[in-house]
Design a protein with these regions (language model features):
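PLP-dependent amino-acid enzyme catalytic core
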Residues: 1-299
Length: 299
């Protein structure tokens, strides 16, 4: 039975590429807009790729023993992906996160068997990170994933996402648009590609402006990610919270596609690019990191 999987880990990747014809026409895009639907991963986000790749890298490096405990400070999709992949592989996982994160995320990680330690909300992610580092310091069998610094993060896209895009388009890709979280998805295998990074307008650190509060989950961490390489990026576009959410809603209504808020930001940027005269007949691929269900209670 060739189409039967033996583990959820085998279901990560090979996500569909969808031509958003109605949305492109409605927004007068001269280019074809192709959405890489990462919410087709088993835990509904692009971070499933990163979670699995980080675990596999630890396995390949011989770092794991029967007492190994993976530790990560995260408030979002990476933690959920790690919880599911660790459950499938039989590993222990401890997640640290601020106490003011949504109950849905906390419950979902615990549902997969992860231990979730909540830190004071006033300490933000820095507090969660400090707690994770303390746990690793006290336990010689603990391994901290450090997604922002883990080479497996960009490798998940260099050897996965980007290859899939090139195969599915026959290499006919002119522009790649991605909202920037850890910046791993900006790693490509095509030197001729024009790469556009997207960040929140109120926290446009890639454009040299100060960090600030915003309402686009998963991106705009307030600092330049370690893997971000401006030599690989042709343009940085900043999108407002309202533009991101409005585009996500419009995509749902016109295409029946439940894209998340960061996907809305990336699509908004792609549609603006697609309206440029020189984009006529071009193909723009947009990374759609996750779906809207995880954010319905906060929009």
């Amino acid at each position: 039975m060739k189409n039967v999987y033996n583990s959820i880990t085998e279901m990560v990747g090979r996500t569909p590429l969808l031509s958003l014809n109605k949305l492109a026409k409605q927004c007068k895009s001269k280019a074809r807009i192709l959405g890489k639907c990462e919410f087709y991963n088993p835990l509904f986000s692009v971070k499933d790729r990163v979670a699995l790749k980080m675990i596999e890298a630890a396995e390949a490096g011989g770092e794991i023993n029967e007492n190994t405990v993976f530790v990560e400070a995260t408030s979002g999709n990476t933690g959920i992906g790690l919880a599911a992949m660790c459950a499938a592989k039989g590993y222990k996982l401890v997640i640290t996160m601020p106490e003011n994160m949504s109950q849905e995320r906390i419950m979902l990680m615990r549902h997969f068997g992860a231990e979730v330690i909540l830190t004071p909300k006033d300490d933000g992610m820095k507090g969660a990170l400090a707690k994770a580092e303390l746990l690793v310091e006290r336990n010689p069998d603990a391994i901290m994933m450090k997604q922002f610094y883990n080479e497996a993060n960009p490798d998940a896209h260099r050897f996965g996402t980007s290859i899939e895009i090139l195969e599915d388009t026959g290499g006919e890709v002119d522009v790649l648009v991605s909202a920037v979280g850890t910046s791993g998805t900006l790693i490509t295998n095509n030197p001729d590609l024009s790469v556009v990074a997207v960040e929140p307008k109120s926290s446009a650190v890639l454009n040299g402006r100060p960090a600030g509060a915003h309402k686009i989950p998963g991106i705009g961490a307030g600092f330049v990610p370690p893997f971000y390489n401006d030599n690989l990026v042709n343009e940085v576009m900043d999108i407002t919270d309202e533009e991101a959410l409005d585009t996500a809603r419009e995509t749902a209504k016109s295409e029946g596609l439940p894209v998340g808020i960061s996907a809305g930001a990336a699509l908004c940027a792609a549609l603006k690019i697609g309206q440029r005269p020189e984009m006529k007949g071009k193909n723009i691929v947009v990374i759609l990191p996750d779906a809207i269900e995880r954010y319905l209670s906060v929009i």
